[in-house]
Curated annotation (Swiss-Prot):
Active-site residues (renumbered): 102
Binding site for Mg(2+): 102, 241, 243, 245
Family listed: Belongs to the phosphohexose mutase family.
Gene: glmM
UniProt keywords, alphabetically: Isomerase, Magnesium, Metal-binding, Phosphoprotein
Catalytic reaction equation(s): alpha-D-glucosamine 1-phosphate = D-glucosamine 6-phosphate
GO CC list: cytosol
Protein name: Phosphoglucosamine mutase
Cofactor notes: Binds 1 Mg(2+) ion per subunit.
The EC number(s) this enzyme carries: 5.4.2.10
GO molecular function: magnesium ion binding; phosphoglucosamine mutase activity; phosphomannomutase activity
HAMAP family recorded: GlmM_B
Organism domain of life: Bacteria
Length: 445
């Protein structure tokens, strides 16, 4: 069991100006990380950020702490999170640090680390960093202080990496694509990747100003993308979140295509090409339609806990190469070491180009089940509503009514006193009624 005080499942995150996302904390974090990572040999760390205004302040604090510990910082400027995983590997840096709060609003920020191999930092190393933070900062001798420099071709390197995951024999020259970069870290990457592969690109959400990241654009709000795809009569739309590790797509009719559908397309294409190894990993929230569609293809499917960290763990446990969350995290271990929105999107585009099929048609083999989610607030400290007999009884009744053609999932939020009630089945009216019946039982406790 982990005793970590600051690190969560995806690094350290919070509201800027409130602990722990403060300049003094981040400076000490940089120093503590430097002390731990310096023990492993290399003395250079890559530092990247998304487009939040607070990134300037936090990268300076990190760099000062690292320098005091004797490590040098290599700045990339705004870059997608998966780009840092790639650059950390290619530069043989001891670690990569990303300053980002992903899909959160601009006033939040966070810090996460990648190991030298481009994977998330092991728990043991995060715990060692936290232990170091309990000590007083001490500076190395002046001659051993770290330096700071910039990787001037970071964007170009990553663009070429992304393009290399798209088959040489294919082209996007017949596609008109609207790309929404969420005013985030992909704003200068994704449009160029698609254009260099031949696509006719219309870019939105590519004017970051420090405070508009994820604001009514991007993977968490595709309404602007849907409207633009229809207005431009485009073949499809592609949306990324603020740090580029999520992708959501929109077909030519304006229908949203989520991470479950994206994984279905990629897994089916891998099967057709004889490249699929093993099965596919989803989460407890993955649509039942995905599980049934993969079963029809003979592709094994497993569910992990919600969170890309747990998806990756399950993939590694089973030796499988494809995993995804319906929120748009898609992990393709044959291509990269972490979730990469651009790379995942390119694999869908390759399937479209190779089969001369629209995104809409590629999704047609998978029927999405209606999935109703109701959040119920409860009084903290009043006991666990999920253990109450009345809630268990109603849940059992609903599960019996759904049989093997539906699911019930009750989850407690990890950050606030909420119970998330999810009911999934073939009939939307029925699952809506069932979800509210369970929610009412939770409220009555």
């Amino acid at each position: 069991m982990s005793n970590r005080k600051y690190f969560g499942t995806d690094g350290i995150r919070g509201r800027v100006g409130d602990a722990p996302i403060t300049p003094d904390f981040v400076l000490k974090l940089g120093w503590a990380a430097g002390k731990v990572l310096a023990r492993h040999g290399s003395r250079k760390i890559i530092i990247s950020k998304d487009t939040r205004i607070s990134g300037y302040m936090l990268e300076s604090a990190l760099e000062a702490g690292l320098a005091a510990a004797g490590l040098s910082a290599l700045f990339t400027g705004p870059m997608p999170t998966p780009a840092v995983a790639y650059l950390t590997r290619t530069f043989r840096a001891e670690a990569g640090i990303v300053i980002s709060a992903s899909h959160n609003p601009f006033y939040d920020n966070g810090i996460k680390f990648f190991s030298i191999d481009g994977t998330k930092l092991p728990d043991a190393v995060e715990e060692a960093i936290e232990a170091e933070m309990e000590k007083e900062i001490s500076c190395v001798d002046s001659a051993e202080l770290g330096k700071a420099s910039r990787i001037v071709d970071a964007a170009g390197r990553y663009i070429e990496f992304c393009k290399a995951t798209f088959p040489n024999e294919l082209s996007l020259s017949e596609l008109k694509i609207v790309v929404d970069c969420a005013n985030g870290a992909t704003y200068h990457i994704a449009p160029n990747v698609l254009r260099e592969l031949g696509a006719n690109v219309i870019a939105i959400g590519c004017e970051p100003n420090g405070v508009n990241i994820n604001a009514e654009v991007g993977a968490t709000d595709v309404r602007a993308l849907q409207a633009r795809v229809l207005a431009e009569k485009a073949d499809l739309g592609i949306a990324f979140d603020g740090d580029g590790d999520r992708v959501i797509m929109v077909d030519h009719e304006g229908n949203k295509v989520d991470g479950d559908q994206i994984m279905y397309i990629i897994a089916r294409e891998g099967l057709r090409q004889g490249q699929l190894r093993g099965g596919a990993v989803g989460t407890l929230m993955s649509n039942m339609g995905l599980e049934l569609a993969l079963k029809q293809l003979g592709i094994p499917f497993a569910r992990a806990k919600v969170g890309d960290r747990y998806v990756l763990e399950k993939m590694q446990e089973k030796g499988w190469r494809i995993g995804a969350e319906n929120s748009g995290h898609v992990i393709l271990l044959d291509k990269t070491t972490t979730g990469d929105g651009i790379v995942a999107g390119l694999q869908v585009l390759a399937a479209m180009a190779r089969n001369h099929m629209s995104l809409h048609d590629l999704c047609s083999g998978m029927k999405m089940f209606p999935q109703i989610l109701v959040n119920v607030r409860y009084t903290a400290g009043s006991g666990d509503p999920l253990e109450h007999e009345s809630v268990k009884a109603v849940t059992a009744e609903v599960e019996a009514a759904l049989g093997n053609r539906g699911r019930v999932l009750l989850r407690k939020s990890g950050t606030e006193p909420l119970i998330r009630v999810m009911v999934e089945g073939e009939d939307e009216a029925q699952v809506t009624e069932f979800a509210h019946r369970i929610a009412d039982a939770v409220k009555a406790v």
